[in-house]
């Protein structure tokens, strides 16, 4: 990280504003900085042992007012008025409820009007704000970086440390700029941008870095789109992803329940406007992407970096020069039951999942509804549409989107992480293939033996209608009903 009197990147500014005690030493021997944490998000999976640690040490939660909890990973998305059937999931949810009650932490339980995926409720409540440090025991905490916050996932022992001290010892990260300039072609979205970025730099390309996404294409994105991009930073190996706040950010936050009001709002915005990378600041790494060259993207393998444009065929491992890459591709194709050279558009799916902290927001649901309106989900396809929060669900209902989903033959569910991960009832059966708007396509991620293709909401909707991986352009010649 840069010293204060030099031009600084956005990440360096936020970092330096939160140093409680600076580490001493140089290079690898340098001690960590002690960083103050502004917002701590908690869910049922990674928190039980952390609370047990507090209990054993006789410690309280230092700042319960800066801590918020929700139930998202393990909760069902149907019959939410009934007890959770799976005993492990039920125990984790019940344990979170007891811990929050004991330690005085706000909790939005299943069915609550503000319940939802942790990375969706933070922004929608206005808790996530520019210049903050945000942590959660979840990989995709980088979502909140869309607001110009330094947000990162942490482990259970670190969760306990933050609960006890509201601080975290961290070593400074390297910085990377991902510049995306130009105009996106029609039908190309934020999800396609980030899938293309990961395919370009690889799943380890951002290791040890905070990525700042910059350029005209990024600035043109809505906050929902920016959250999608930052959400998947971890899939490129990065510690966090950030986008400088601007008028789009401020308008999204204005009037949110926990956003500043009145004179405090004006003062906050004045500070937030300074949260930009200085002219002349140096990044450790920098890459450039021409947005006008992008097209709908889809993964073919078992990590998010194994992706290609939808118009391409399945890659041939024999054409890969790197031996490790070739072996990984061969293993992935075997698991995915795909043959090299098969056009991506000819790959049939059994299931389509729309949701997750990547693409479970109202903008995503509107895109899907626009495509499904007047059309039917293919007879051989099961489609789940799962809102990222109860507030998103209520908004979708008020706009008539739920009726469009059900009329098309999709299942319109309650809020939760759902099929993003195999920790709740929404799972793939062995051998089932899914086009998913989520963020990970690892082996077994959506259920043991399940096969996942990561796609944008638009591609997911078109795929549901046609039954094979498709883009909205493929539907143009097909009539609606």
Swiss-Prot record:
Gene Ontology terms describing biological process: L-leucine biosynthetic process
Origin: domain of life: Bacteria
E.C. code: 4.2.1.33
Required cofactor(s): [4Fe-4S] cluster
Catalysed conversion reaction: (2R,3S)-3-isopropylmalate = (2S)-2-isopropylmalate
Keywords: 4Fe-4S, Amino-acid biosynthesis, Branched-chain amino acid biosynthesis, Iron, Iron-sulfur, Leucine biosynthesis, Lyase, Metal-binding
Residues binding [4Fe-4S] cluster, per UniProt: 357, 417, 420
InterPro entries attached to this UniProt entry: 3-IsopropMal_deHydase_lsu, Acnase/IPM_dHydase_lsu_aba_1/3, Acoase/IPM_deHydtase_lsu_aba, Aconitase_4Fe-4S_BS, Aconitase_4Fe-4S_dom, IPM_dehydratase_rel_enz, IPMI_cat
Function description: Catalyzes the isomerization between 2-isopropylmalate and 3-isopropylmalate, via the formation of 2-isopropylmaleate.
Family: Belongs to the aconitase/IPM isomerase family. LeuC type 1 subfamily.
Name the UniProt record assigns to this protein: 3-isopropylmalate dehydratase large subunit
